[in-house]
């Protein structure tokens, strides 16, 4: 029989948009076990995206058990556990029964557009930006809460009586992990969130890290619904679920993009990462000073260690990244698989004058033009599939540059390099394009699944499993670095052509 060793590992639960994962790492930062399970995407009508919170909780239990069984360990051997999650996705439930009053409304869901238009018209964007760091749009949780209160029968009345809880997905999982309705030891389960998730609701004053009564009133949300806000890294409570991770301390909670920055070792002011997933998510550590963007970005909290002031960040999100490649594959059927785009794009030396502006749902950061629509410009009889494939990859790189330039203006200094992660960074042509279009080095780590890894690092820091940031940085390996090969003149000529193409996406 294998001898068990106390506190030899750290676990991380990564609850994402399409699946839930559990990873377990050792003290070298190596991932020793992984388990994952997808959940259903519920699409009741166009623009609506929902998840079943109960299914997700069931999947959490399943993947944690699978990851532990795979390496034959017990909770005794796990020092601590961290939780990361798809941000903004909204759940309201009855703590007396554990039953959600409605499906989780996912961050991608756009049903709250009309609520947001009315809110922006009444209050103006600047007030919300100055107070929360966010712009009023369909992403944050606040408008989703209001929609559930206004549209699900009986929910507003129950909320006003204090009978219901709201949470983003971290809050829902923490409540279940710490006992839920069972209360094995008679103690109430935690109803908490961390500052990074709270900062994505439109309800938290980013200056004080507390819920803002005036903002809650503007959205007509009872404050009794809201969880307690806690630092990202510190002592939450031990797991009180007999089935999984019994008595393991929860010591780290982060929203997914902040967790990815943590997993990249983005601890210094100016450190910046881009996650190339369904969309593109750029986050820059701006240090202890809050910077409210003047160039179309959002301000958020990168992380907070218990007993310390928060560390802030600038964020720019682009809606179309990997999803543009999926569109090429599934809707146009132009490529057989997503990875095949690189092979086709390499067949030509340039885009042949073709540009694709993927404003399928408008343009997001830093332009924020919801009425823009996707266009393909520069088509001639000379253009072929290879040129279009190249234009798709270039669109990803150009959109990233737009956000990077905005970050540099807000931060008052140029980026020295960009750290990258996510599935698309396996496309080496795209990464070279990115270095060329930015004019800086692009750095890919050894493990590109940095969201789960960053959560494990945060939990390990919170429990003392890892000593400090320096130790964590030593554990992060660099797999590859791309350096610019374009001249400055070539770079700016290409960027000017992109900007010209974007003008055709605007309504006339």
UniProtKB/Swiss-Prot annotation:
It comes from the Bacteria. Pfam families: FGGY_C, FGGY_N. One of its GO terms (molecular function) is ATP binding. ATP binds at residues 17-19, 278, 322, 326, 423. Disulfide bonds: none annotated. Inhibited by fructose 1,6-bisphosphate (FBP). One of its GO terms (biological process) is glycerol metabolic process. This is Glycerol kinase. The gene is glpK.
